[in-house]
């Protein structure tokens, strides 16, 4: 990790209650193995929570939104452990879950500060005829689950997929990004 302290104090300090609205932690692979159905697009370096918190404190960032990395698939353990450590007063989270995840699991996630579900598809995924249509049942089911909890949907995917999903996105009954 870059030794930010060797560089001295930052030229600009974040204002009080500043929030990093999208960051990810990567734990030791032996404890948090990558779980991707496809080969990983990149090999994430270990990026533990203490290193990030140290940098955030140096910059004056007090609050955080954890976003589930695609490298972990639907295994949110690393992120949820980090959220437990930080505490609900300082963080929120966006998970990747199967549309049929048990209500009790979602309730536990909500209690930790989770407020959204991420639908992850590789941003470099080649266009496949009918793929966006095949996603619609999952999107609608996750939309319903999010609506029950007051959560939002977060999408990661290639531009062609976003373009094909625009009519669906416009009709969602939950916020999305």
Place the predicted regions along the sequence by residue.
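Mid-domain alpha/beta scaffold segments of enzyme catalytic cores
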Residues: 2-149
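Catalytic pocket-lining loop regions of alpha/beta-barrel enzymes
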Residues: 132-177
